[in-house]
């Protein structure tokens, strides 16, 4: 097991080998890392926000898993998966360490000491007493829990939430300042709309780049690609539970331009799916492939039947025309013969 480079294979030789599947499920199908700002597609598959936006923008407008057509506008935040990843990744190293240490320790033999009725009664009474004590401590400590105000999003002790709401969120703590630990949430970041290269002018894109504090140099293609990548990076950052600063996103854009846009004629960056075993892929998606193959066969058979039916109808129509012509020929011959009769 290697906790320095987290990988699902870390669990294979442990007593918790079943966590390998959990570990794999909480990873993005594109980058193979734990989900960052996970987004769910219209077809129900989840990817990192940045990964899926780059993939749909630069590679294909189809889901990398099931190949159904997808649009960026269909993406939605997957809050449940984000929470699962947060908790699992936070405890992953600890669980691995505990499992590894437990595997090295011999299992001690449990020897039951002789018991007496008085001793058992004492244990039961002591257990009940400890239970009551712990319950009391839990009740007392629950008032100290920090909760979020549903109106102003301030954090304050649970016992003070009602008074805080009664005062229209204008009350203060004992020291005259805000409640201990109170911190109002900053204004939520907003996503940026993408531009259509076919209808958007270069001057307008250059103005948008300038408004964002970005470079406005380069050709038309460079400007559009720069702004498109900025929108991808920024919107993915907005999806993140803990967004980074704008300067950090600008640094990401500069690194992208340095490594990807080597010149004006550089091809769009391609998102590739790495480290995939062909046999595992086929086995994992066998049902999907079987379904697609069956649908393709039905489609081919249907087209073939329609073509045969059309040909048969054409042949029948041609045969009817021939039959009608043959039926009319004797009458025509008879009329011609009668027309040449000599009247005496």
Swiss-Prot record:
Molecular-function annotations in GO: single-stranded DNA binding; ubiquitin protein ligase activity; zinc ion binding
Annotated Basic and acidic residues bias: 303-337
UniProt main location, coarse: nucleus
EC number: 2.3.2.27
Catalytic activity: S-ubiquitinyl-[E2 ubiquitin-conjugating enzyme]-L-cysteine + [acceptor protein]-L-lysine = [E2 ubiquitin-conjugating enzyme]-L-cysteine + N(6)-ubiquitinyl-[acceptor protein]-L-lysine
Family: Belongs to the RAD18 family.
Protein name: Postreplication repair E3 ubiquitin-protein ligase RAD18
Originating species: Yarrowia lipolytica (strain CLIB 122 / E 150)
Upper taxonomic lineage: Eukaryota, Fungi, Dikarya, Ascomycota, Saccharomycotina
